């Protein structure tokens, strides 16, 4: 029987890479999001079960946690807009609280949280603080979660991130921002998947 993982944020920039790699590794992958399957449709999408659901309404998706080996939270926003209720507290903290609470109720062995490395804390202080609050909540519920802290993701689909990568190289040449190392999104997704698989093998569950 294949291991089942339930992913939130699976049709995002990072999430699509992650669910694709996980399905290629033989996992039963379920992605929950408001939109369901990404558009336009690609061949690999057939290997993933795309479920429409509101993350703020657990009744939409909690039954999916039955017999799951892992729940993966890769939802998050780096820029907030309080006028539309898109705040760090709501999307980076409250969603983590909802998911980890439901995962614990269903006794899901592994909880994976995509946090963030504070690469430019002086510019995004509130963002990184929200990620830390989410981590604290998760660790209070799951004594041994898998928390990943990547740097900024870059990829060819997002032109803005490519520009950031080029500017970073220039800054490094000048001896600036040495701690800031943008990470290819494909590399990051593979790293998270590898760490999750290792956790499954060693049975270091929450």
Mark where each language-model region is.
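Short glycine-rich anion-binding loops that position phosphate/pyrophosphate groups of nucleotides
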Residues: 77-78, 118, 153
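Oxidoreductase cofactor-interface core, primarily capturing Rossmann-like NAD(P)-dependent enzymes
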Residues: 11, 25, 121-206
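NAD(P)H-binding glycine-rich loop region in Rossmannoid oxidoreductase-like domains
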Residues: 38, 44-98, 102-105
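Conserved Rossmann-fold NAD(P)-dependent oxidoreductase catalytic core, especially the SDR/UDP-sugar
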Residues: 28, 85, 90-135, 141, ...
